[in-house]
């Protein structure tokens, strides 16, 4: 009886003192680890997060992985997801794509959108498992039907290209629109180009520019490149070499692979002063970390 009373008092003491930012952090962590060792899943998750983020303890990815794995082995879906992602990236453990696929698949059985989307990508690109486009499509679709915007984009892409499913532009547009309406920048950018060209939708320069500008505002490299093309060709806006060079330069700096060639092409018809103006605007965008660059 005396031991039980002491344990109850000790738990209350360390938790209360921890909330006040007192000196009992070590005791508190020790108490949590004892509780986690007894099989308490919530505490295992908490410790995994603490060691991952350095909350009250030094960051330790190995200990983080260990505690997430304990909870994952008991069927906890959030823990299974974290274990899968750490295995996929080699964080706190050796990189193991095949093991990551197994854990994503376990989490996906519960219908978890994130897990389903990751399983879809691994099937589509042969990461940790063999390529199986039909399984990829089915996995994406399950997540897309639960309003996961990334999965909606992948479903749209596969319908558009006929990957793992028959080509169906009409349904592809529906899924692109759903994904874009939820803020997915890949969907916004691609759908924007469709509206500019009238691919699968009535041609609408206004709608196309609206979508591409929205994606560019969030720092999307391909959207920057498309804005360069818009100004180079004068699509719905006056043709402007400075703005064309600007957006090609921003796209290049943000990682777009072919934008540099377009930037160099735009420079051929520009004066040195115009190029310097465009470069100054591009640098201003870079200082904003490529976000909210539409208005300087």
What is each PLM-predicted segment?
Residues 20-23, 257-296:
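Terminal, low-structured helical/coil segments at or just beyond the last alpha-helical repeat
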Residues 46-53, 57, 82-89, 93, ...:
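Hydrophobic face of amphipathic alpha-helices that form TPR/SEL1-like repeat modules
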Residues 23-30, 58-67, 94-106, 130-142, ...:
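Structural signature of tandem alpha-helical TPR/SEL1-like repeats
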